[in-house]
């Protein structure tokens, strides 16, 4: 799980202004960090099917946020996927 320090640094790197914690960019970055953590978790705990369902929910939520951002502002979308190293 992400510590509050890790969450703070992710928010700081992706926020649009000083008090921004809920923009799509920040939400996508936080979801990506949780997805990455769970992916590493499953390399060790292959039979943890309960958490795998949670991972699939997180991936779907990130996909919806990316689609929203793509429809609203294509430049910000491209910037986020490039910074996070995601596929289109």
Curated annotation (Swiss-Prot):
It comes from the Bacteria. GO terms for biological process: translation. SUPFAM superfamilies: S15/NS1 RNA-binding domain. InterPro entries: Ribosomal_uS15 (IPR000589), Ribosomal_uS15_bac-type (IPR005290), uS15_NS1_RNA-bd_sf (IPR009068). One of the primary rRNA binding proteins, it binds directly to 16S rRNA where it helps nucleate assembly of the platform of the 30S subunit by binding and bridging several RNA helices of the 16S rRNA. Forms an intersubunit bridge (bridge B4) with the 23S rRNA of the 50S subunit in the ribosome. PANTHER family: RIBOSOMAL PROTEIN S15, BACTERIAL AND ORGANELLAR (PTHR23321), SMALL RIBOSOMAL SUBUNIT PROTEIN US15M (PTHR23321:SF26). Belongs to the universal ribosomal protein uS15 family. This is Small ribosomal subunit protein uS15. It comes from Syntrophus aciditrophicus (strain SB).
